[in-house]
């Protein structure tokens, strides 16, 4: 009986992160769910900046209120707290999600706040590894590739109720700028990122669509285009030029019969950051990247879920040592991992990231890109 329950519950948990939330209020059309997890996590690596304790806690809520038969208000908030620093170091925490919106029956939903960019509608299919993954080209606060500030999102499920499985989304992102290099307050000045202009963005627009073909197969695609800030366009050096930052992606997945397979391909232009730009490193923004991810997983009825994956991002026409037109792998690794679910609330996992970047290439040391392997061990309590 336990095996049958796990076989049903675990895929549902993986498909929707907060689907197993604890309902704390449900009355008179008002509903509030609380969800979260504590991950006791440790990395083993020759890279001293990665090696060691990585424990964190994540908590959030999802709420909705029934306004009338066709109109529902909703909101979500999610917060991350790192637990691998001393109490004297101060807060090491941040808001992951915070948005509110309205759902108009079959006519879709509209929300605004900090939310996932539409490119992640496809990227999320391969971002299913026990610990690593989802990092060939998607980063938080990098345009609409991951979690992002100031996004207004319209979503429609089943194409106005007319086509089962056909979903689409439209998204607009407002400008987000850090303080300029000469400490002059310009633009929005709402990025507290150490003046790293790589994570700024101008106004942008995105669209995504996914289709549940049936028999476990789904296909999806997304596209975004954004203005770049004046600081980004004029930075020079290893920072790509160009007035626009563009990205597109397409993906496929199969999720049935305890088997999960997913793959995606994407390209970006004037968008993707690599390496570090502080402490004398020569990281930058790639003029173009070509990105690929694939994962294969199997869910055993007794709770074990092994996974094998491969991810890569190739930077094109990079500027390195004052030479233009260099091509380099920015991300390239194989990943072997496994998760064991004791029940719907507790699991343990191991994840081995096998770094395939060439540690003899001076580019990676100069840019501050790690070429070391990482083994992650974790225990998770979730609710």
From Swiss-Prot:
It is found in: Cell outer membrane. InterPro entries: Gram-neg_bact_OMP, Gram_neg_porin_domain, Porin_dom_sf, Porin_gammaproteobac, Porin_Gram-ve. Residues 1-21 form the signal peptide. Keywords: Cell outer membrane, Ion transport, Membrane, Porin, Signal, Transmembrane, Transmembrane beta strand, Transport. Disulfide bonds: none annotated. It holds the Pfam family Porin_1. Belongs to the Gram-negative porin family. Homotrimer. Forms pores that allow passive diffusion of small molecules across the outer membrane. NCBIfam families: PRK10554.1. This is Outer membrane protein S2. It comes from Salmonella typhi. The gene is ompS2.
């Amino acid at each position: 009986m336990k095996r049958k329950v796990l076989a049903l519950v675990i895929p549902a948990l993986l498909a929707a992160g907060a689907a197993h939330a604890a309902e704390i209020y449900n009355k008179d059309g008002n509903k509030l769910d609380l969800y979260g997890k504590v991950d006791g996590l440790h990395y083993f690596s020759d890279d001293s900046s990665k090696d060691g304790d990585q424990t964190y806690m994540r908590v959030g809520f999802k709420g909705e209120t029934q306004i009338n038969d066709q109109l529902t208000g909703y909101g979500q908030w999610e917060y991350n707290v790192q637990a691998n620093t001393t109490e004297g170091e101060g807060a090491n925490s941040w808001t992951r999600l915070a948005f509110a919106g309205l759902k108009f029956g079959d006519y879709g939903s509209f929300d605004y706040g900090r939310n996932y960019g539409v490119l992640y509608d496809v990227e999320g299919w391969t971002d299913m590894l026990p610990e690593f993954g989802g990092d060939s080209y998607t980063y938080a606060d990098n345009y609409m590739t991951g979690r992002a500030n100031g996004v207004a999102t319209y979503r429609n499920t089943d194409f106005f109720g007319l086509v089962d499985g056909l979903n689409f989304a439209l998204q607009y992102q407002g400008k987000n700028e850090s303080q300029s290099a000469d400490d002059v307050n310009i633009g929005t000045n709402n990025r507290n990122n150490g003046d790293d202009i790589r994570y700024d963005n101008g106004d942008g627009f995105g669209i995504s669509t996914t289709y549940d073909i049936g028999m476990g197969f789904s296909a999806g695609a997304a596209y975004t285009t954004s203005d770049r800030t004046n600081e980004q366009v004029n930075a020079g050096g290893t920072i790509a030029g160009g007035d626009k930052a563009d990205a597109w992606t397409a993906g496929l997945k199969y999720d049935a019969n305890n088997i999960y397979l997913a793959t995606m391909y994407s390209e970006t232009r004037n968008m993707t950051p690599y390496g570090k730009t502080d402490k004398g490193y020569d990281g930058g923004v790639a003029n173009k990247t070509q990105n690929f991810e694939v994962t294969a997983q199997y869910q055993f009825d007794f709770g074990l879920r092994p996974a094998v994956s491969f991810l890569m991002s190739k930077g094109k026409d990079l500027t390195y040592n004052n030479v233009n037109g260099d091509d380099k792998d920015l991300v390239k690794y194989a990943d072997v991992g496994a998760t064991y679910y004791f029940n719907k609330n507790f699991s343990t996992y191991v994840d081995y990231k096998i770094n395939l970047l060439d540690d003899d290439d001076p580019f990676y040391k100069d840019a501050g890109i790690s070429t070391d392997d990482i083994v992650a061990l974790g225990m998770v309590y979730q609710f």
